[in-house]
Structure formats: C-alpha cells, structure tokens
A protein has these predicted regions:
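Short cysteine-rich clusters marking metal-coordination/redox-active sites
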Residues: 90-93, 110
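Detector for the mature cores of small, proteolytically processed
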Residues: 79-81, 86
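Long, charged N-terminal interaction/targeting segments
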Residues: 1-76
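Cysteine-rich micro-motifs
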Residues: 104-116
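Short metal-coordination and nucleic-acid-contact micro-motifs, chiefly zinc-binding Cys/His arrays
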Residues: 86-89, 97, 103-106
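Short functional micro-motifs and their immediate structural scaffolds
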Residues: 96-101, 115-118
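Catalytic-core loop-and-flanking beta/alpha module that positions acidic residues
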Residues: 84, 92-95, 119
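Extended, charged helical/alpha-beta scaffold domains that provide interaction surfaces
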Residues: 4-5, 118-121
Length: 123
C-alpha cells in the first residue's frame, strides 16, 4: 500500500481554459491546501480562470498563469512567491518543512512527517 503522500510527489494538471479553484485545491496535499487556500482563492478573485497549470515536483508547487490574462505579470510574481514558500512548508501539515537531498522525489516535510515517511519507505 502506498504512503498517503505518494500521489502528490509528482503531479501535473493543465487546462488552457483555466483550472477551477476547486480542482487546484483538491489536488494539493492537505498541508499545502490549508496553508495556501486563501491565496489561491484570492488569485482567482483578481483574475478568474487565469491559473492554467498545476505542477508538483521535487517538493515544490508550481502554478502557471494564462499569458493573455490582464494581470499576467502580477499573477506570475504571486505564483512564483507561492512556489518559493511551498519549498519551506510541510506538504502534510502546513508547518515549516524542508526538502532533503537524499530523498528520491524530495517531498517537503517537517521533521515528524519526514521520519514517518522514511520509516514507511524502509518497511
């Protein structure tokens, strides 16, 4: 049986017409969903349907914005800051986390969740 984090280690969802906020939120690990929910909803309020791609790789969240959006430059800056912050937030609980180089997929985890994850992998 896979670890509950496994589906989130590498994930890409794209739609050129815009991803609904509900789709983005339901495809985030719970720690990131809780931490970034408000910001993602505000991005959509400012520029509806501007988020066209969600990508999770190596413990970092990437959200791409439609280039034809009126607020493309602003949204790109906001989503870039969100990506940088996601690299310091535990995917499981939303507390401070970090990516460890020795991990194959480098999930961003706090110490307790990291220990749980490596113990699970070794079992």
């Amino acid at each position: 049986m896979p670890h509950s984090l496994t589906p989130y280690l590498s994930r890409t969802i794209a739609d050129d017409t815009g991803l609904p906020v509900s789709t983005i939120l339901m495809n985030l690990p719970v720690g990131w969903e809780n931490k970034f929910r408000t910001l993602i909803m505000e991005i959509d309020d400012i520029s509806p349907s501007s988020m066209v791609k969600l990508d999770i790789r190596d413990g970092v969240l990437y959200i791409s914005v439609n280039e034809s959006s009126k607020y493309h430059k602003l949204m790109t800056l906001v989503t870039r800051a969100l990506s940088q912050e996601s690299a310091r937030v535990c995917m499981m609980c939303g507390e401070f986390g970090k990516r460890r180089k020795e991990q194959e997929h480098k999930p961003c985890l706090c110490r307790p969740h990291y220990l749980d994850y490596i113990n699970y992998e070794e079992a």
